[in-house]
Amino acid sequence: MIKIAPSILAVDLINLKDEVKLVDANGAEYIHIDVMDGHYVPNITFGSNIVKSLRPITNKVLDVHLMISPVEKYINNFIEAGADIISFHPEADDKPFEIIKNIKNKNCKAGIAIHPNIKVAEIAKFLELIDLVIVMTVVPGAGGQKFMDSEVSKIIELKNIRDQQKLNFEIEIDGGVNKETSQICKNSGADVLVAGSYIFSGNKDNYKTLIDSLR
């Protein structure tokens, strides 16, 4: 079954812990944490302290997406805070292979995120080393954007590579995921769907229904 990763980018931060507990109790497998530095992307969001504060309240996968540059100097902070998966944009640092090795050597899963401007061929060299590929279906930097249909071909391409080479990475979709676009992603080969506004702008009593509607 496809996994759902509610994105706390869309949460009212005053109620962050309560909201995470709610989606945890209502079927989410991952909690997605978007980290933005105001440099790689124009927005600024969370640091490793948010991961540290969430770790004691959920045993679900803390799925950290770093939209920062440079990357390497901050990796250990997120590992020590309790991240289960750390994904980054390889073009944002000049040592992507070392970063992947560092993450995995510390019993954390490593992922690569693909900006809409980046082709699958440009990150293919990492695929045998990583646990997750995030296909960005919006331009990184803000929540609530419209799903980019042009990126669906990347999902299909990644699934074909995985099948042909017998690799083990998950394919995660991040951006504009709702009831309709989730089916496109699922049918194209996605394993994990990140959803922020679709879930957290709804009624708290309906979180289970909203999460289940994405499967």
Identify what each model region corresponds to.
Residues L16, V23, D34, F78, ...:
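Conserved, mostly hydrophobic/aromatic
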Residues E19-V20, E72-E80, I118-I130, G175-L193:
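Catalytic cores of alpha/beta
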Residues N26, I57, A81, K106, ...:
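Structural motif
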Residues D37-T45, N49, P116, A124-F126, ...:
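Glycine/Thr-rich beta-alpha phosphate-binding loop at enzyme active sites
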Residues I44-V64, N102-G111, E151-I171, G175, ...:
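Alpha-helix-loop-beta-strand connector modules within alpha/beta enzyme cores
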